[in-house]
Amino acid sequence: MEYATKLLLIVSMAAAIALETVVMARSWPELLPLTIGAFVVAAAISLAFDEVCVAVVLLFAYLMPALIVAVHGKLLLYYGTIWSAAFLGAMAPRSVRHAWAFPGRWKAPLVLWAMTIAATWPVVALRELDFTPALLNITHLASSMVGGPPPLAASWIADVAVTLGLGILWFDWLFVAFPHDERRFRQRVVAALVASWAIATAAGVYQLFGDMLFLNRGLFGSLGRASGTMIDANPFGVIAAAWGPALIAAAWLTRSRTLRVLAVCGLVASWLGLWASAARTAFATGCIASAFLVYAVWSTRLQHISRRTRTVLVGVGVIGAVCVTLAVVFLPATSGPLPRLRNTAPALSAPSVAAFFKEMWNRNGYGMVATHLIRAFPLFGVGLGSFHLVVPDYHFLLTHTIIPPDNAQNWYRHQLVENGLVGSIGWMLWVAAFAWFVLTVRPPASSRFSAIVVKGTLVALALVSLVGMPTQNIAVAVTLWTFAFWYWLLARTTGRAVHDPAPARLGRVTWAAIWMLVAVSVSGTAYAARDGLRVPQRAVTAAWPYFYGFSDVEPTLDLGRHSTVWAKRRAVAVLAPTARWVKLTVSLDALNVAKGPIDVKVWCDAALILATRVSTVQPITRYVAVRDGQTRMLVDTWVSGSVRPADYGLNDTREQGLRVEWDFVDAPPAGVGGL
């Protein structure tokens, strides 16, 4: 079961990458061969040199966006499949040869989380296609009132799954490859990511002092915010902030003075990079991580100095902190995060402070909608990767305003609103177990300084995730998992190479519990996908146009007036009635009837109003009342057969399944019953 579940995660991640690639290859045809090639080449090299291959892939972790821009000329989120495919290919050969390698207390939660991701994202992606794969080719539809066609919605869900799933797979791969071998881990993994960070930060510093539009001609360049080589200032700032103290941690694990000098220079560069990004989460990350660095120096390096000297140093530190605070509050600043921080920070009054904390909780309305959705879908959530798809509709329903595009959300609440209580059991148990480990384990003296510094970065990322989503970027997510493993090594190392026996396998009862929870989560997600979270049902709830499956009118169809159209074998329309009743009339073409009796089904608002076998061309009419409180009506039609008149020598290439006519009336005729 251990090998099978890991293989399932790998296959699921490969499928998610494939979906993204196929969809986005329409705008960049070379993306498909590049992604396939990246996976195949990385997997082939990894068969013989897996650690070297992984290091090479990690070297491009923070550089790939700029490289794509340089080669292709523009960057879309999903073009990152090239790097994701290479990363998966580099890990796959060793991963499939080993069982899950997580420490015992973490294995069950992480495997449960991984299986929940692997099994639920396809259901959610199919939901956005209304379980009709043909919608992958439809671009006139929207997934919310603000737009977004079904292919992009499904791709976004796949991208979120890849970010989460590859992170877990990477964490496991590290336990397989470097069990307690911190030095080799540092030489292979940390060195590769540091090299990538150095290039990205150098680009960010150049953007700050030289040309802000260098590799930065998009939104953030126009805002005067550096993005390094990541094209997005927010994750770049977090990466810049995270690695500064980490360089000190790595250098002080060696005896090289050169590396230590370079690490100090890197710490300065990291602050320049995060400052250039003007990212508030990056500034908070840098402050928290640097505070842990100061504490590490104080608690491990200054133990032997006199009490008087320590008192002086404390005084100097307090004065310095006060000066920095006053500078942040009062000194003029036109660059960096300070202007944005000042716009966010509260005034020195109780109402202002209360409003500040309320805004941090609501986060431009995203938190408010998340809280509402948790109440509405508590057990199974809105679906993995779906919060950003449904938030515009529900924000409009709650406030009657359009929510501005943003990524402002509490990460933990974000996972809860997407996965629900059942789907969140895995990640919740893992977060709790790892947090307990980080906060309670005392590292040995030989690595205590570096462990405290790495702990500081982990704590910083955990805290900023209360008000943001930095790890939604796959490079930041991989970095977080890397730091988590690094801290485990530093906290557990004894100064000698130790190879523990293979982690204990999960028992039958544990596996039964895991699969029961996964099955319940998938079932609940599928039920919601056919019920209140079905895309056309969301269109009914939020009153936006939605239709597909009509032969002669797409991509335009007037859903708010009397119309007659030919539906294919399956069609969906969200009507906008102008009266209390909807008159629906359906009929078949003579050519279709000539083939034999045809089964016909029609649903209105999920209620079956017609299910019959038709053998004539006579129309069938039903009168259906609009539900109280609704301004829209969802109509689904299905027929067992269709024809193309062109196949019979006629000049008509349309697929004709069911002729559908709708009209809006105040009431059915006298003597005619309604539904």
Question: Can you say where each PLM-predicted feature lies in the sequence?
Answer:
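Alpha-helical transmembrane segments of multi-pass inner-membrane proteins
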Residues: 2-20, 24-28, 37-45, 85-87, ...
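Juxtamembrane membrane-water interface segments that cap and precede transmembrane helices
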Residues: 67, 140-151, 217-229, 361-365, ...
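A membrane-periplasm/extracellular boundary helix in multi-pass inner-membrane enzymes
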Residues: 72, 126, 202-211, 272-277, ...
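TM-adjacent membrane-interface loops and short helices in multi-pass inner/ER membrane proteins
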Residues: 232, 348-352, 357, 362-405, ...
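C-terminal luminal/periplasmic domains and tails of membrane-associated envelope-modifying transferases
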Residues: 527-675
